């Protein structure tokens, strides 16, 4: 009987300690891993093809992409990024590669909001990134707001935070 009471007490304490907020993107609970801030951008052609997929004509490889910012002294510094492949979860399938960077989001959160993205031989584009907490809230490219990928209420949180650039 004592074992049953102890097990119930432990379950009660764990249940109280691990309550998650209903708001998606809310803070981590006591048991979950801490989430990092990130920046994610898909790049598409005017006809909707993935320009980060090397198999598509006119696409850019990671070597053809430069992401950088100017520090307080005006020195250009590169920003680490990766190309994430398409993904699928039980609720969502996303068929596009994404330019992904934790570093860009951390720098933007610390106060420097202006970055530059150079794709192949194109002119560098100015990115103005607004980060609030652990979410990239807004992206302007050359002073034009870039929309988030269309998502529904049941979609994964990550999908709801991918910006979609059409060239």
Question: Predicted regions span which residues?
Answer:
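Tryptophan-paired
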Residues: 54-119
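Extracellular Ig-like/FN3 beta-sandwich strand-entry sites
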Residues: 36, 109-114, 122, 136
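Glycine-rich, aromatic-bearing surface loops/beta-hairpins
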Residues: 123-167
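Detector for glycine-centered tight turns/loop "hinges" at secondary-structure junctions
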Residues: 47-50, 72-74, 122, 143
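Charged, amphipathic alpha-helical segments
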Residues: 21-25, 45-48, 92-103
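Short amphipathic, basic-aromatic surface patches that mediate peripheral association
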Residues: 28, 43-58
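Bacterial Sec-dependent N-terminal signal peptides
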Residues: 2-7, 11-38
């Amino acid at each position: 009987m004592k074992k049953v009471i102890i097990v119930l007490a432990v379950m009660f304490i764990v249940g109280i300690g691990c309550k998650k907020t209903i708001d998606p993107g809310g803070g981590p609970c006591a048991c979950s891993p801490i989430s990092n801030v990130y920046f994610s951008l898909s790049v598409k052609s005017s006809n909707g093809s993935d320009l980060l997929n090397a198999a598509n004509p006119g696409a850019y490889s990671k070597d053809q992409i430069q992401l950088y910012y100017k520090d307080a002294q005006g020195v250009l510094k590169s920003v680490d990024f990766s190309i994430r492949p398409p993904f699928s979860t039980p609720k969502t399938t996303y068929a596009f590669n994404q330019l992904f960077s934790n570093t860009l989001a951390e720098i933007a959160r610390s106060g420097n909001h202006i970055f530059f993205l150079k794709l192949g031989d194109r002119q560098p584009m100015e990115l103005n990134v607004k980060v609030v907490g652990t979410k990239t809230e807004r992206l302007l490219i050359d002073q034009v707001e870039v929309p988030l990928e269309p998502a529904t209420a049941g979609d994964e949180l990550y999908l709801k935070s991918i910006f979609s650039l059409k060239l």
